[in-house]
Each structure stands twice: as structure tokens, then as C-alpha cells.
Amino acid sequence: MRTLFCLLLTALLAGCATRQEPKRYVWVTGLRPEKAARYEELHANPLPAVNRMIKECHIQNFSIREREIDGKLYLFAYLEYTGKDFDADMKKMAADPETQRWWKETDPCQAPLPDAAAKGKIWGDTKEVYYLK
């Protein structure tokens, strides 16, 4: 019995030791003023299949914030990624028909910043300069 307990405890501790912190991402894009109400309306009632796909792709604590700066609207997305292969999960999401349908609705609302647009992307990356756990 003691040996079984030790084996179980060792397995449990090993599982805890390999658990990694989520990788945090913050992305930014512009929001077209004439489409802001539509964008907010879409996100007030997102497609359930899209939310499921986000979770299947190991994304948690996902939020999008809106901010006006110098008369222009911007969106800031925060998410935590808990998977092992971000690129593969993003390809999986991009291949999902319901997500594609969703993006056909949301993409026209967004105004990519020049650096993101040059890469054919909607959202641009940001650099973390401080983190307090």
C-alpha cells in the first residue's frame, strides 16, 4: 500500500512539475468607426462554435478591449495560450468553417495597422515590457 501511495504521489508531483505557465499574447488592430456598432453587436452574441474552437485551440482568458486614441478606434486582444504548438492550433482554427464564417463578419470591421497589413494580417503583435505575477 505504501509503495502504491508513493507511486501515485510521484506521478502527481511529476504532473505538477511539467505544467507550464500559459503564454500571454496581446494583439492590436484598428476598428472602423462606421463598423464599431456592428463589431460590438457580433461580440455580444458570438457563434457558440467559434467559442468552442477557441477553447479547443488551447486559448483561455480571451478578451477584446476597445479604446479611442486621437480620434481613432483601436482593439486590443488579450489571451493566454496553454497548448504546445501555437502555429498548429492557429492553422486548425483558420481551417474551421464556422470560424471562417465568423471572420467574414468581423474582418471588414477591422482596420489593420500598417505593420500587420504588410504581413497580410489583421492583428499586430505587441511586446511585453513588464509582467508581475
Segments (PLM) and residue ranges:
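Short beta-strand-to-loop capping motifs
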Residues: 29-31, 78-81
